[in-house]
């Protein structure tokens, strides 16, 4: 399908300090490089099928189970915010309002302006933060056909 898939580790998803520490900063540099060289990248926050490594990490580190769905969007927001601050010239799809909220909170002084409906249930917005602009597609987490990502990528990445 042409996507580069990056699966986050439990530590990357749940450790609030990860991306401000040495390993996290190095990971962000590598991710920047991947995004700069590839038109289609997915950040996957799911555990491998049949594995609940994120929950095990949370238990081992004293993180309440109720914190998991809060910390994952915050981590995604940190990653996306970092890419926007670096000036990544791309469009992003965020599934679920929690992910979008995590990104906006991380960016601090950000403005999200709806541009229009890309497809039914998918909103295209302009995200501006510290003079950096990018386009963001948002949709509810459970909405859409199985081919949604590839169909969108085909439309967005098609030469004009």
Label every model-predicted segment.
Residues 1-160:
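Active-site catalytic microenvironments in core metabolic enzymes, especially phosphate/sugar-handling
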